[in-house]
Amino acid sequence: MTKPIPAASGTAPAALFGASDVRRLAEEIGVRPTKTLGQNFVIDGNTIRRIVAAADIHADETVLEVGPGLGSLTLGLLDAAKSVVAVEIDPVLAAKLPGTVQQWRPGAAKDFHLVLADAMKVTELPVEPTALVANLPYNVAVPVVLHLLQHFPSLRHGLVMVQDEVADRLAAGPGSKTYGVPSVKAAWYSSMRKAGVIGMNVFWPAPKIHSGLVAFTRREPPVTSATREQVFAVIDAAFAQRRKTLRAALAGWAGSAAEAEQCLLAAGVDPTARGEVIDIAAFARIAEARQDRQA
């Protein structure tokens, strides 16, 4: 077992979990990672340091971590941030985590806040987070990111580790073959970019695919009189039939293909274009044009 050593000025970095530590902690509480919860625990300290460095966390920040699991990433975040608030859905893991933090980072235990909850249902936290850093379960990654960006405007930036294919989708721009609903909806809240790829062998159990890092920076949504819900409805309709022209794909949303064409023309969008080539600002203009025509 790696002995936990508090960080000190001018000394080596504080110890992080190795593979044996992760397996021992899991064994102590009888946990086996489950596919249902998308659990893959990071077992490599250098990977944790890489994630924390890529997240660009400042010493005065409060970080929101989703799915801390056994605490591999949590320890690295506590070393970098002012405080960490972690949201964990698994009650067994949640019960173990405070004790782990106390053992490995006793000086930072007071700066650690744990919330036992489903991240998709969290709308309030005990402290206001300024950054999101998380190793997200592959099966809920996009909904969780969008939910947190919606409900916590204090989140100014962050870094999420997701399935590499999902990372490509989140960071894609108009015209890319991976550009779709996740890309456009994420762009409502922030600018996203691919920040790296993580191999399979740094996890336990090892997933069958690589993971991708996505960094984001909050930005204001497009200036529009349309609501977020109205804009997102256009996005959903456009990509439900992504190979069709917008005139055809938005016919159901607008009431007819002819009405869809009028909305598109009013928004300055080519009716023969497809949704995969226009940006979030154009989707907002389309939603606004529809509202104006109904007024």
UniProtKB/Swiss-Prot annotation:
Its EC number is 2.1.1.182. It catalyses: adenosine(1518)/adenosine(1519) in 16S rRNA + 4 S-adenosyl-L-methionine = N(6)-dimethyladenosine(1518)/N(6)-dimethyladenosine(1519) in 16S rRNA + 4 S-adenosyl-L-homocysteine + 4 H(+). GO terms for molecular function: 16S rRNA (adenine(1518)-N(6)/adenine(1519)-N(6))-dimethyltransferase activity; RNA binding. It comes from the Bacteria. One of its GO terms (cellular component) is cytosol. Coiled coil: none annotated. It is found in: Cytoplasm. PROSITE patterns: RRNA_A_DIMETH, SAM_RNA_A_N6_MT. Keywords: Cytoplasm, Methyltransferase, RNA-binding, rRNA processing, S-adenosyl-L-methionine, Transferase. Gene3D superfamilies: Ribosomal RNA adenine dimethylase-like, domain 2, Vaccinia Virus protein VP39. S-adenosyl-L-methionine binds at residues 40, 42, 67, 88, 118, 135. The keyword Transferase applies. HAMAP family: 16SrRNA_methyltr_A. Specifically dimethylates two adjacent adenosines (A1518 and A1519) in the loop of a conserved hairpin near the 3'-end of 16S rRNA in the 30S particle. May play a critical role in biogenesis of 30S subunits. Belongs to the class I-like SAM-binding methyltransferase superfamily. rRNA adenine N(6)-methyltransferase family. RsmA subfamily. This is Ribosomal RNA small subunit methyltransferase A. The lineage of its organism: Bacteria, Bacillati, Actinomycetota, Actinomycetes, Micrococcales.
